[in-house]
A protein has these predicted regions:
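N-terminal subdomain of nucleotide-sugar transferases
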Residues: 1-27, 146
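Short, well-ordered alpha-helical microsegments
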Residues: 20, 83-86, 153-154
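Conserved nucleotide-sugar phosphate-binding/catalytic loop shared by glycosyltransferases and other
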Residues: 20-45
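Acceptor-binding helix/loop patch of EC 2.4 sugar-transfer enzymes
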Residues: 36-46, 94-133, 174-188
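Short N-terminal targeting/anchoring amphipathic segment
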Residues: 64-82, 96-98
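Structural alpha-helical scaffold elements that stabilize or flank donor/cofactor-binding regions
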Residues: 69, 137-138
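A short beta-strand/loop micro-motif in the catalytic core of glycosyltransferases
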Residues: 140-149, 165
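Carbohydrate-associated surface elements
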Residues: 151, 170
Length: 192
């Protein structure tokens, strides 16, 4: 919304949410939808990437319609986790693509394989590698990555890690800081 306040900018957001207003705080909203669903009984290791390709195809067709109407972005910022941005550079190759780089999956020590009580199976390792195809395909075309924390950025291997800039997306910790004179006491079942 901040960029949309400048009349020299045209900000467009593509959304899979139907029945949205035409704009929100100066941002033009363009709704689109997938033409198909995931394949029943598809191989378990490719369910994730198939869903992302389906969403990417839907966004690709929406982007083609936007281009046909005369819209050409200078910059595209997208969360790559759902696949929508997979093919946007095919429509607008000159646009700079920055992807929200939230997490690169690992078979050990991150989201799976970290608890000795629940050891990861070798097949899980294979599934995790295939799950990263979306990240790999995005970094093949992305000009930059944006990550909210240093830890999240650190989950990505090189050469991708060096393309990622950490930009905190939550509370402004420079403006919102602890107040040393404020305290809070709680009465608990333990008497404290």
């Amino acid at each position: 919304p901040a960029l949309a306040k400048d009349p020299n900018n045209q900000v467009v957001a593509m959304t899979m949410r139907p029945n949205q207003p035409a704009s929100w705080q100066g941002v033009r909203l363009v709704a689109y939808g997938a033409k198909r669903q995931s394949t029943p009984n598809i191989h378990a290791w490719v369910t994730d990437i198939e869903a992302k390709v389906i969403r990417g195809e839907a966004a690709f067709h929406c982007a083609q319609a936007l281009k046909a109407s005369g819209f050409t972005p200078d910059v595209i910022i997208a969360h790559c986790g759902w696949g929508e941005s997979l093919f946007l550079k095919d429509v607008w190759p000159q646009a700079k693509l920055a992807i929200y780089s939230e997490f690169y999956y690992h078979a050990r020590g991150a989201d799976v394989g970290f608890d000795p009580e629940f050891p990861s199976q070798i097949t899980e390792d294979c599934r995790i590698r295939v799950k990263n195809l979306n990240n790999l395909l995005h970094f093949e075309v992305a000009d930059a990555g944006l990550s909210p924390t240093h830890w999240q950025a650190s989950t990505f291997p090189e050469p991708f890690r060096s393309k990622i800039t950490v930009i905190h997306d939550g509370i402004d910790t420079q403006a919102i800081t602890p107040n040393a004179v404020v305290s809070l006491s709680l009465n608990t079942a333990h008497g404290a």
